[in-house]
Amino acid sequence: MILDRKNVRAIAARARRLAENLGEVCGLLVDHGGLVTLVETRNKSTRPLSFWIHPADWKAIEQAAVRLGSRVVGTFHSHMASDPVPGAGDIRGAVHGHAMVILDAATGDLRAWRIRKGRAFRLRHRFLQYRQTAN
């Protein structure tokens, strides 16, 4: 999985801010022909330290992705007080076969997973960083 470093840094900063109030950042992973971006959604959960991707946001992002020739390939969320490893609730709520990226809000550490048959399997990821060139 190739992730945009600038995009991930922005989401990690948002995760740190939300963690101050026991909130989690969450959203969808959108694959644009090999480059995956994290697209934030509203967190519909009313409980601290939990997330629920807003269904209307999910639908809108999925429709926009299809129009652009992209596709939703998974979800992401932050953990405030634990390693970026899927817990039992994360696995139960996951879409079978989708990727899941978890960010540690405190450290910015990120890990990618694939959820299949009730189990989490670690995915390799790397970052793409764009270089600005002078004209």
Where are the predicted features?
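Conserved beta-strand-loop surface patch within small alpha/beta domains used
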Residues: 1-72, 80-135
